Amino acid sequence: MLNFLPGNPQDLKPKITVIGVGGAGGNAVNNMIASRLEGVEFIVANTDAQAINQSRTERRVQLGTTVAQGLGAGSRPEIGRAAAEESLEEVIGQIAGANMVFITAGMGGGTGSGAAPVIARAARDHGILTVGVVTKPFHFEGAHRMRTAEGAIEELSQYVDTLIIIPNQNLFRVATERTTFADAFKMADDVLYSGVRGVTDLMIMPGLINLDFADIRTVMSEMGKAMMGTGEAEGDKRAIEAAEAAISNPLLDDTSMKGAKGVLINITGGMDMTLFEVDEAANRIRDEVDPEANIIFGSTFDEKLNGKMRVSVVATGIASEAAAQPKPTVVSLNTPQAQPQPRVAAGGTAGAGFRPAVVTAQAAPAAAVAVAQAQPQMEARTVAQPAPQPAHQPVVTAQVRVQPAAARPAQQPMAETFRPDPQLRLDPVLERPVPATTSLQADFRADPDMGHLSQAVSHIAETAQAAPQPQRQPEIQRQQAPQPQRQPEPEARRSGGLFGLLRRPAAAQPAPQPQRHEPAPMAQQPRQEPARMGNMATRSEPSVARAGEDLDIPAFLRRQAN
């Protein structure tokens, strides 16, 4: 007894449908129709009525007649989503009965970004194997459009079994200066064309190793991110060259076949294709994927390819491997937290406002602090010189030696810190004489030009009566009370000569410190310094305020002039 299959045997063939959503999807469908791809049905769905009328397919769906009114989505994904929801029943009627659906769209706009996820969800809910092939915008289209595209791709990936992403920016990898704008987009559409043709050839074209649709579903069902590639070559090394061209598609989203879990390989050639060439091409692709990957291989013949070989590859399950690799890169970001801790420990003894000053002051030696406190002559000279003033005066006022910058705003603590301890730090003076004070006085008295000295004496005699400046004397007496110890210096000069002061600056200071407190003779020193304007112009101006300290110098100069 014979059993006949009911119906037409043609109805049992797998049905593959390509639906283009939006303007970019409609253009891809038109290019595939122009390439005369067989065994595939084409559908276009758009909110723009004008774009639908230019389509080459007769199966058209006007999305959102009420929402968009045939005017498009205006680059607003929410309008495209609402339009697809409104016309979803009509879309389902068009794709009913299909075993596999390729949804192609351009991400970043309104219709493709909003309607493609809705259509993919409906197709997958009806048990249809759904593959998404989408493009990303160029860089010159702006960051806003790129963010819209990335959000739409993330949403679309939840409703498709396999997703293939083609960035338009990668067209510059294959385009030249003479490549037209239309030809560049046709290159992107060829990725979709080669992927669909690789699947249909396995099921339609005759061959020694044919595959059924169940094998394709096994490789592509719920595999996530995928890549498609096709390579064609001729010559002695056509097998290797075609395989390498298929696995290195420059237009895809920087994907690699490393770690792919499912691989579909289709090798097509003429009747002159040898077994060695098929083995060589298949092994080249197998070396790139996971050793445990599910590889489905098929080979067909095409009389038009005599002397050539074409290798088509669909690698799926790439997203799961790529997501596992970036995990170790998140671990080395907590080390900089230990940097502020040493700063707090270094300045813990001082106040919060003086922490930077304490850190810099710790490098100064303790002997320098003792020398600065035991020499009132140097204090008077440092006040006259504005440069070293912030370096010595704060150290004298601070007995703790930790906060040298705390005494900068006021000079009154200088007299308070000097009273209880006037002579305890005189020993370091014998060890470290200050050359700055002696060199200043030596340069001042070793001038051989006696004409300048006589002019200075006459000038001081005239100006001593005109400008006594009594208002500054109590300030100097209050701030620098122990400074009268410099008065015995003229006695040392009388006994030891002009250069005796250079040799004994420290020995003459400690004996007569508490004896004399005369502010009047100290007011004559500013008269001597303005007399010598050639070398001491910068030092004479601030020393006028210390007139009570420098009156002994003109008396000495008068005796030298006589």
Curated annotation (Swiss-Prot):
UniProt keyword Iron, yes or no: no
Composition skew (Low complexity), residue ranges: 404-413, 464-486, 500-510
One Pfam assignment: FtsZ_C
Biased composition (Basic and acidic residues): 418-428
Region annotated Disordered, chain positions: 404-428, 462-562
GO biological process: division septum assembly; FtsZ-dependent cytokinesis; microtubule-based process; protein polymerization
Record: residues binding GTP: G23, A24, G25, G26, N27, G110, T111, G112, E141, R145, D189
Keywords recorded for this protein, A-Z: Cell cycle, Cell division, Cytoplasm, GTP-binding, Nucleotide-binding, Septation
Gene Ontology terms for molecular function: GTP binding; GTPase activity
Localisation per UniProt entry: Cytoplasm
CC terms in the record's Gene Ontology section: cell division site; cytoplasm; microtubule
Recorded phenotype for the gene knockout or disruption: Essential; it cannot be disrupted. Although it colocalizes with paralog FtsZ-like, the latter cannot replace it.
Family per similarity comment: Belongs to the FtsZ family.
Listed HAMAP family: FtsZ (MF_00909)
Function: Essential cell division protein that forms a contractile ring structure (Z ring) at the future cell division site. The regulation of the ring assembly controls the timing and the location of cell division. One of the functions of the FtsZ ring is to recruit other cell division proteins to the septum to produce a new cell wall between the dividing cells. Binds GTP and shows GTPase activity. Mild overexpression impairs cell division, leading to very elongated cells. Isolated protein forms filaments and bundles in the presence of GTP.
Subunit-level organization: Homodimer. Polymerizes to form a dynamic ring structure in a strictly GTP-dependent manner. Interacts directly with several other division proteins. Interacts with FtsZ-like protein (also called FtsZm).
Name used for this protein in its record: Cell division protein FtsZ
Organism in which the protein naturally occurs: Magnetospirillum gryphiswaldense (strain DSM 6361 / JCM 21280 / NBRC 15271 / MSR-1)
Name of the coding gene: ftsZ
